[in-house]
Amino acid sequence: MTASPSKLAQLRELSVVVADTGDYDAIKRLKPVDCTTNPTLVKKALDLPVYADLIERELAWGREHGGDDRTATVNEVADRLTIGVGVKLAELVPGRVSTEVDADLAHDTQATIAKARKFIAMYAERGVSKDKILIKIAATWEGIEAARQLQKEGIDCNLTLIFNRSQALACAEAGVFLISPFVGRILDYYVAQGQTPASIDEDPGVVFVRTVYNEFKQRGSSTVVMGASFRSTAQIEALAGCDRLTISPDLLEKLDAEHGELPRKLSPAQADNAQFTPIDSDSFASGLAADPMATEKLAGGIDTFAKDLHALRKTIADKLAG
């Protein structure tokens, strides 16, 4: 008797599966279409043997080229390591590698644009074309405006930390390539408020992604919806059929070990009727202000990303000094 396909195998037939990791071996094993990096994942990569040559090369560059401005040297080495890890990952996946712009720049449109252009140029110098890369930007108003300009330049963007409909709609209007609504962090907020959902169909993170997906499909938006920040395989299964799903290695492993039918939950053909209301900076701000969860989680997410970046830079500074 032929064994039934795993739930991961079935999911691959319904959604593009993305690995939320920079773990080289995990990506080789799990074979996602896309993958993503961030400062935390790059910091973890510093301890992986596969990146040892890259790390030594970039630290040597920092020691040789570092001037009197130690901070600038550390920051440049962090950028070079980030791109170096991305280059290695681009060799493994047939699709895209998301590379995160500094969270410190989340409220600075021009600085975000400049850093994105720099990253794309660094990738090009290392033989990776921009069509292999997504520039990951926090979905503040300033970040969305940066993405609007970058998209016009042919630089595709992944707008992350999406918690609110205003953010999602503003991204679609800006022509953003992809958005990442954070399923698990939305659930975390409501559970902390004592509002645990009775079923997966009432999970506020799942409901949010389904709503955004349906609105985008009904409107004919080309912006890709990629569910992110999952806490369980149940959340993933509840969004089977979403354009893309970025999943941690441990949950990918669980899905690969599970069998049984995995039905499609989202489909363009089943999208609800929806009309978009134009979003400007004022309506964007008021939409966030009226949503305590989104306000808290967006600010907290940016803060966490910034702390992770500073931790990466501190590790690099220590290695350069060692």
Curated annotation (Swiss-Prot):
List the InterPro entries. Answer: Aldolase_TIM (IPR013785), TAL/FSA (IPR001585), Transaldolase_1 (IPR004730), Transaldolase_AS (IPR018225)
Instruction: Tell me the CDD domains matching this sequence.
Output: Transaldolase_TalAB
Please classify the protein's predominant subcellular localization into one broad category: cytoplasm
Protein name per its UniProtKB record: Transaldolase
Q: What is its EC number?
A: 2.2.1.2
Known catalytic reactions: D-sedoheptulose 7-phosphate + D-glyceraldehyde 3-phosphate = D-erythrose 4-phosphate + beta-D-fructose 6-phosphate
Q: Where in the cell is it found?
A: Cytoplasm
Q: Which residues form the signal peptide?
A: none
Biological or metabolic pathway of the protein = Carbohydrate degradation; pentose phosphate pathway; D-glyceraldehyde 3-phosphate and beta-D-fructose 6-phosphate from D-ribose 5-phosphate and D-xylulose 5-phosphate (non-oxidative stage): step 2/3
Q: What does this protein do?
A: Transaldolase is important for the balance of metabolites in the pentose-phosphate pathway.
Q: Name one Pfam family in it.
A: TAL_FSA
Active-site residue list: K136 (schiff-base intermediate with substrate)
Organism of origin is Xanthomonas axonopodis pv. citri (strain 306)
**One GO CC annotation:** cytosol
Keywords from the UniProt entry: Cytoplasm, Pentose shunt, Schiff base, Transferase
A Gene Ontology MF term for this entry? transaldolase activity
The entry assigns this protein to a family as follows: Belongs to the transaldolase family. Type 1 subfamily.
Give a GO biological-process term. Answer: pentose-phosphate shunt
PANTHER family (UniProt xref): TRANSALDOLASE (PTHR10683:SF18)
Subunit info?
Homodimer.
